[in-house]
UniProtKB/Swiss-Prot annotation:
It comes from Nostoc sp. (strain PCC 7120 / SAG 25.82 / UTEX 2576). Heterodimer of HisH and HisF. Residues 3-211 form the Glutamine amidotransferase type-1 domain. HAMAP family: HisH (MF_00278). Pathway: Amino-acid biosynthesis; L-histidine biosynthesis; L-histidine from 5-phospho-alpha-D-ribose 1-diphosphate: step 5/9. It catalyses: 5-[(5-phospho-1-deoxy-D-ribulos-1-ylimino)methylamino]-1-(5-phospho-beta-D-ribosyl)imidazole-4-carboxamide + L-glutamine = D-erythro-1-(imidazol-4-yl)glycerol 3-phosphate + 5-amino-1-(5-phospho-beta-D-ribosyl)imidazole-4-carboxamide + L-glutamate + H(+); L-glutamine + H2O = L-glutamate + NH4(+). The active site is at C81 (nucleophile), H186, E188. It comes from the Bacteria. Gene3D superfamilies: 3.40.50.880. The lineage of its organism: Bacteria, Bacillati, Cyanobacteriota, Cyanophyceae, Nostocales. This is Imidazole glycerol phosphate synthase subunit HisH. IGPS catalyzes the conversion of PRFAR and glutamine to IGP, AICAR and glutamate. The HisH subunit catalyzes the hydrolysis of glutamine to glutamate and ammonia as part of the synthesis of IGP and AICAR. The resulting ammonia molecule is channeled to the active site of HisF. Keywords: Amino-acid biosynthesis, Cytoplasm, Glutamine amidotransferase, Histidine biosynthesis, Hydrolase, Lyase.
């Protein structure tokens, strides 16, 4: 089975991500060791919490460069929730620079009548890259589970793989560019749809190994 390294920097619900990967047919290893990232067939960067502590935690474990090297190598990489946001250059939530792997900023939802912040619960995706491997075998507007007050705003709109609408605000819900994929929602909390997304990621890992 493909080995997927799940980065542990004390900012994620790693157990449920790992359970989802096991159901998807992968062997997850929880690690903050860059040698393990190098050996793994793919890497996942999960994350819940605040932007500044997350990037500080990654940097204190000397994980910034290994993450950049992993993505540059062409190895399949998936960011989840905060693990999407810290790939960007900066966030309205904090003062620390992000990893800057994707050009753009993290912005906060603007309050408007009839919505709650954080955006929490089930919502439908609008697939802007419908042919992305992440969305294989999914219905056209799948329901997934969100918990976030901030969203990513990529400088290059073509990296968007899906959007979501909260109130009148339509924002990026996922990005995909070559081997780099990341989602704002929680696939591990998104029932069968989320499991299919993780399975699609693992399928891509298998294809990469076979090649």
């Amino acid at each position: 089975m493909p080995v997927v390294a799940v980065i542990d920097y004390e900012m994620g619900n790693l157990h449920s991500v790992c359970k989802g990967l096991e159901k998807a047919g992968a062997t997850p290893i929880i690690t903050h060791c860059h040698q393990e990232l190098t050996k793994a067939d793919a890497v996942i960067l999960p994350g819940v919490g605040a932007f500044d502590p997350a990037v500080q935690s990654l940097r204190s474990r000397d994980l910034e460069q290994p993450i950049k090297d992993t993505i540059a190598s062409g190895k399949p990489f998936l960011g989840i929730c905060l693990g999407l946001q810290i790939l960007f250059e900066s966030s309205a939530e904090g003062n620390q620079p992000g990893l800057g792997i994707i050009k753009g900023k993290v912005r906060r939802f603007v309050w408007e009548p009839g919505i709650t912040i954080p955006h929490m619960g089930w919502n439908q995706l609008e697939l802007t890259q419908p042919k992305s491997i992440l969305w294989e075998h999914l219905p056209p507007q799948p329901w997934v589970y969100f918990v976030h007050s901030y969203y990513v705003d990529p400088f290059e709109p073509q990296v968007r793989a899906a959007t979501v609408t909260h109130g009148t605000q339509t924002v990026t819900a996922a990005i995909a560019h070559e081997n780099l994929m990341a989602v704002q929602f929680h696939p591990e909390k998104s029932s069968n749809i989320g499991l299919q997304i993780l399975s699609n990621f693992v399928s891509q890992v298998r294809e990469k190994i076979a090649a």
